[in-house]
Amino acid sequence: MKPRNIAIACGVAGVAVGLAAAAGIVYRKQIKSAASLKRLTDYADDYDLYGIDIAYDYDLDRIIAAGVRDDQAYIDAVVAQVLPGVPAHVQAPQFACSAFVAVDAEGRVRTGRNYDFKDDTSALLVRDHPRGGYASIGFAALNNLGDNTPLDSVAGRAAALMGPFAQLDGVNECGVSIAVLTLDSKPCDQDTQRPVINTSLAIRLVLDRAATTQEAVDLLSAYDMHAMAGRDYHFFINDAAGDARVVEWDPRDPDRAFKATPVTQVTNFYACYGDEVLPNQKNGELGHGKERAAAIADVLDAHTGAQDEAVAWKALRAAAQEPNPEDITSNTQWSVVFDNTEPAAAITLRRHWGDIDAFAL
């Protein structure tokens, strides 16, 4: 599988003029960010990989302070910071997937991740260098941002600026990676009088502020969780030391107690109740997809101590899913291998296993 490098740049001047006209005011750093938007692949179905470098500043604490107990409040708080006064359509993200950790003979740590969702989407590679935070690279689904071809309109370019707040996965400069996966339980909506974060903010907080998995666990456990888009979720977190854990909110606890369970792979079932989950079936609130986790485990176990990048891709292929309109967690939209030791990402869209694009942080 040979990595490809395709870059179709948008016109910097056109983006700057268009965004300024749409907003009625020149946002220097927002314009610089929008001008960086590029199409990185060129598939016939127009569902492509795009990339954007985020140059504007944001304040996560201010977004949290605004209150994010419902999805619209979160979207409004983000838009108010990123594009005040500019209409931008964003919908609450939706998520599925498989994730695992792999360690090769030299001790290099990688995270594999399939993003599965029934509706096709373009992907947005987001490079972020937050002021006072860790640089990171990760991916958002452009259908969640309202435009699968964002270079075709000013509104699409403006929506792409929201990428950092709609990411589904990523890795930061410290080697901490995070990926979100959907569950079958009732959406978590904790109310223990702590500050509230939601699914998307959890990803942003970990990438910006956590240097290890333990720091990520400590960070997330300090907040109440509001699950977005009417579904429930958990997070697979890994770091440069290979400390892989699944962070969840216990569906059997009335207060949705926070749990962090060490695992090597997970899909759409509760890791904290993994022994009760059966493959090839729904398991009520405990979830489904254990057969995909078993397929990953079979590949990794066959290469214990030598789980290199090729093995990681083999495991991703073993767990990838074809389209099924009746199953929200079908249809692998992208597969990515994050390097936690030397932070980087390699990605392919929609099971095009011969087309892998590699990106350094």
Regions found by a protein language model. Give the residues of each.
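A recognition module on extended beta-rich or small alphabeta surfaces enriched in W/G with H and D/E
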Residues: 133-143, 271-293
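General structural feature for long, well-ordered alpha-helical segments within catalytic domains
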Residues: 212-215, 219, 292, 312
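Secretory/export targeting leaders with adjacent low-complexity proregions
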Residues: 215-231, 235
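Non-transmembrane alpha-helical segments in soluble domains
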Residues: 204-207, 217-220, 297
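Long, charge-rich alpha-helical interaction segments
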Residues: 282-312
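Extended amphipathic alpha-helical segments with heptad-repeat/coiled-coil character used for oligomerization
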Residues: 230-280
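N-terminal mature-domain region immediately after signal-peptide cleavage
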Residues: 2-210, 225, 306-361
